[in-house]
């Protein structure tokens, strides 16, 4: 999140400047003022519009700002509010930077650009009211998923290009396109945000000289300081495309100097498994000579977009596990691909539905990946426990909070009937699953009809309640028994959810294994999440090795998510520390049982 300007400068700006706003990239963990949250008023008043906002939950922090949910007192509409203390913004360049952000961003309005809804100040703070992007950014998606499928990458890249085309038509160079500045709304639509480094081209042929950008995405002409223009955004999109498909940035090293050297030398390699058409477009965008790169307006005419399958929508499940594309095999076949203009009509041309029972089963998540996740989690917990986080002179647990790491899925209910059938559970999206005693799994989606069946070897197949083989009849009957047992009223509400386009591509994480101790039940999901529910006080831990984070639900049902590395730095209360020690023992037990199981299979 970029620093805002001190209000003294803003007060001298034109009166209507206060109606603008600028999105900020909430980079949790960046240095900020610790006492900020205590000083911010609970009710915020925009003196121009007389709109009143009530401050809600913390969303993130970065630079000089903190971000909170704020709700309009009259309409109850919720926005993210970026709040900057004036006391921290005293330098002239900070004021200039904020003025530039506002003057640029207030002039923009596009489907794929973060919107703003207000900008005002009081004697102590500057407030910016933004468009809410509930699904965070592509950075969190990248941390959870690493390399995406090609159709997903194409889906996101197309929207990034459309947003950037709009910027360039309006003579704006973003200059800091990166995963963390590409936000996602509830429909997984991309919104370009954070215009802190953006600039306006004042005349044709103007070359900017400022050194700016993020190391992994910075263009060589910016590093050389010979002048740069619109082409830097195309370079950044090339880096983004590489990252989405390969799982890491093209020039990334552990040393900043080495990264810059690689960028200047154009030293990167594309793995052989990447589609040659995709590799070709990456190479076109990552040319050292900016004039040799395609313009932003030429990109969507590339074969990567015109001949490849682009989903009209993606399901929320894609944030944590790959989707399934077997429902549209003809669209994926190069010999029968629709042109971009047809695919991009979205809702007007939904993908053809196909009988679910004919879908090819999909096998995902190897044992090696699962063990790797558990090993990572064990190492993360070992590290935080070794720091003795509760034994500090000053514990600042709130500084370790990172809402961007909130889990996508967790188990909200469970019932143990393993003496006869298995363990039933409900996920937070109201889908219901059963891990049967024969090690097969069956999941009923929250639409009340779609089914996902996972065989003992991990092979997945997709069916419906109304269309399934007779061999599954008993298991579907048992699943319905579990479903009714786990609060019929709540699940009826879930079953009434209107299916949205893209849901036909959904795959849900499933329960891989579980066990009980005297103190807790331990649940291990296929997306790497480990959940521990404590019996005595009903507290819960939800651990994610991919985000290196823990969500703690205390006795009062307060839901807080922390980065483990920040708990190591800032400390935590004794209650959380003791549960983290217990969690390490349980993860070690999970890992040991998997290793023993694999040794048995090998012998």
UniProtKB/Swiss-Prot annotation:
Region (Disordered): 1-32, 338-361
Entry-linked InterPro entries: Kinase-like_dom_sf, PLK1_cat, POLO_box_1, POLO_box_2, POLO_box_dom, POLO_box_dom_sf, Prot_kinase_dom, Protein_kinase_ATP_BS
Record PTM Phosphoserine, positions in chain: 103, 137, 269, 335, 375, 450
GO biological process, one term: synaptonemal complex disassembly
Activity control note: Activated by phosphorylation of Thr-210 by AURKA; phosphorylation by AURKA is enhanced by BORA. Once activated, activity is stimulated by binding target proteins. Binding of target proteins has no effect on the non-activated kinase. Several inhibitors targeting PLKs are currently in development and are under investigation in a growing number of clinical trials, such as BI 2536, an ATP-competitive PLK1 inhibitor or BI 6727, a dihydropteridinone that specifically inhibits the catalytic activity of PLK1.
This protein's domain notes: The POLO box domains act as phosphopeptide-binding module that recognizes and binds serine-[phosphothreonine/phosphoserine]-(proline/X) motifs. PLK1 recognizes and binds docking proteins that are already phosphorylated on these motifs, and then phosphorylates them. PLK1 can also create its own docking sites by mediating phosphorylation of serine-[phosphothreonine/phosphoserine]-(proline/X) motifs subsequently recognized by the POLO box domains.
Motif D-box that targets the protein for proteasomal degradation in anaphase per UniProt: ranges: 337-340
UniProt-annotated catalytic positions: 176 (proton acceptor)
Biased segments, Low complexity type: 1-15
Record organism: Rattus norvegicus
Protein residues bound to ATP: 59-67, 82, 131, 178-181, 194
Modification Phosphothreonine, positions: 210, 214, 498
Keywords: ATP-binding, Cell cycle, Cell division, Centromere, Chromosome, Cytoplasm, Cytoskeleton, Isopeptide bond, Kinase, Kinetochore, Mitosis, Nucleotide-binding, Nucleus, Phosphoprotein, Repeat, Serine/threonine-protein kinase, Transferase, Ubl conjugation
Gene: Plk1
GO cellular component assignments: centriolar satellite; centriole; centrosome; chromatin; chromosome, centromeric region; condensed chromosome, centromeric region; cytoplasm; kinetochore
Annotated Pfam families: Pkinase, POLO_box
Gene Ontology molecular-function annotations: anaphase-promoting complex binding; ATP binding; identical protein binding; magnesium ion binding; microtubule binding; protein kinase activity; protein kinase binding; protein serine kinase activity
Phosphoprotein in keyword set: yes
Similarity comment text for this entry: Belongs to the protein kinase superfamily. Ser/Thr protein kinase family. CDC5/Polo subfamily.
Chain residue ranges for the region called Important for interaction with phosphorylated proteins: 538-540
Protein's name according to its UniProt entry: Serine/threonine-protein kinase PLK1
Residues covered by region (Linker): 493-507
């Amino acid at each position: 999140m970029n620093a805002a300007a001190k209000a003294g400068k803003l007060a001298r700006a034109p009166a209507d400047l206060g109606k603008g706003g600028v999105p900020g990239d909430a980079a949790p963990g960046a240095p900020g003022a610790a006492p900020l949250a205590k000083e911010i008023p609970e009710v915020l008043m925009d003196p121009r519009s007389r709109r009143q906002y009530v401050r809600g939950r913390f969303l993130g922090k970065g630079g000089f700002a903190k971000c909170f949910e704020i709700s309009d007192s009259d309409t109850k509409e919720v926005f993210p509010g970026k709040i900057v203390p004036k006391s921290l913004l005293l330098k002239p360049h900070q004021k200039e930077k904020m003025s530039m952000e506002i003057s640029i961003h207030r002039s923009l309005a596009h489907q794929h650009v973060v919107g703003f809804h207000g900008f005002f100040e009081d004697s102590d703070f500057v407030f910016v009211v933004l468009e809410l992007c509930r699904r965070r950014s592509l950075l969190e998606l990248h941390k959870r998923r690493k390399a995406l499928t090609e159709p997903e990458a194409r889906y996101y890249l197309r929207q990034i290009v459309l947003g950037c085309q709009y910027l360039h038509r309006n003579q704006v160079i973003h200059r800091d396109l990166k995963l963390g500045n590409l936000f996602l709304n509830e429909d997984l639509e991309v919104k370009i945000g954070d215009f802190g480094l953006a600039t306006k081209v004042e005349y044709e042929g103007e070359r900017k000289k400022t050194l700016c950008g993020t190391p992994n995405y910075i263009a060589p002409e910016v590093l050389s300081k010979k002048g740069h223009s619109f082409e830097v955004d195309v370079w950044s999109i090339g880096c983004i495309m590489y990252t989405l498909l390969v799982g890491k940035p093209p020039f990334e090293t552990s040393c900043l100097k080495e990264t810059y050297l690689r960028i200047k030398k154009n030293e990167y390699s594309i793995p052989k498994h990447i589609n040659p058409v995709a590799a070709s477009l990456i190479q076109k965008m990552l040319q050292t000579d900016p004039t040799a790169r395609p313009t932003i307006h030429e990109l969507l005419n590339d074969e990567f977009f015109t001949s490849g399958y682009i989903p009209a929508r993606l399901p929320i499940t894609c944030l944590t596990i790959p989707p399934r594309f077997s429902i549209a095999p003809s669209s994926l076949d190069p010999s029968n691909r629709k042109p971009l203009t047809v695919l991009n009509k979205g809702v007007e041309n939904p993908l053809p539905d196909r009988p679910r029972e004919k879908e090819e089963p999909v096998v995902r998540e190897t044992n090696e990946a699962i063990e790797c996740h558990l090993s990572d989690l064990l190492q993360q917990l070992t590290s935080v426990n070794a720091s003795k986080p509760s034994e500090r002179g000053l514990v600042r647990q709130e500084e370790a909070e990172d809402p961007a790491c909130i889990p996508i899925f967790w188990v909200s209910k469970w019932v143990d009937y393993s003496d006869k059938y298995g363990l039933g559970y409900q996920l937070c999206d109201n889908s219901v699953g059963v891990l049967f005693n024969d090690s097969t799994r069956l999941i009923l989606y929250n639409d009340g009809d779609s089914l996902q069946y996972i065989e003992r070897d991990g092979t997945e197949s997709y069916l419906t309640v109304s269309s399934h083989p007779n061999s599954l009849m008993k298991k579907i009957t048992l699943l319905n028994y579990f479903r009714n047992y786990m609060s019929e009223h709540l699940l009826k509400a879930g079953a009434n959810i209107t299916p949205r386009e893209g849901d036909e591509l959904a795959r849900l994480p499933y329960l891989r294994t579980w066990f009980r101790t005297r103190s807790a039940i331990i649940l291990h999901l296929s997306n790497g999440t480990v959940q521990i529910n404590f019996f005595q006080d009903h507290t819960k831990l939800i651990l994610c090795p991919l985000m290196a984070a823990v969500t703690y639900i205390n006795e009062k049902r307060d839901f807080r998510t922390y980065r483990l590395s920040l708990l190591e730095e800032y400390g935590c209360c004794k209650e959380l520390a003791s549960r983290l020690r217990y969690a390490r023992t349980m993860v070690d037990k999970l890992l040991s049982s998997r290793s023993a199981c694999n040794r048995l299979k090998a012998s």
